Amino acid sequence: TDPFGSHTRRLSRRFVDQWLQHEPDARIIYRDVGQNPPPPVTGRWIHAAFTPETQREPWMREVLRTSDELVDELLAADIIVAGVPMYNFGPPAQFKAWIDNIVRVGRTFGFDRSREGTPYWPMLADTNKRVVVLSSRGDYGYDGGQMAGWNHVEPAVFTALRYLGITDAHSLAVEYDEFGDERLQQSLREAEAGVDRLAETLAAARHGM
């Protein structure tokens, strides 16, 4: 339970509940990066990540320990459901730290200077993973309205995951959060209905329906 009434936690919880109705045997991994943020990427982290695994010193493995856990969770997942509120037009720093920790050379993207063409390539392109971003926004009109072009939440998340090869991306958002009036309640109702439909659609797609 969130004491501050997080809309994104409410939507992500609803999606999981709906998913379990369609996929009762699904294994759920829950990670709250808002309450327990991953460590930020540092120079030591980058040095450790770009050092071949067989050459890493003990301190390097320790620096990458949380990143390895997050990458393992990502690799094990069929679907990633992320509650990502909008903070100043972009994702929270805690969620950006999660992104930085899963974009890992040799694990989620490849790099080879001798490779013809681009030296980078996605390592998750054939994994059939899906991502669902459930967001909340204080203002309104981000989808084709007066704030169109100001939303950097979904673009930031989807760009990073597309770089890794995850291209099946979906999103829903609550707006009018700062107004707290009937428009917010209507937006919540629409988002919840959208969550229900999306969970049903994605579950059906898993079974070729």
What label would you give each PLM region?
Residues L20, D72, W121-L124, R162:
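Short secondary-structure boundary/capping segments
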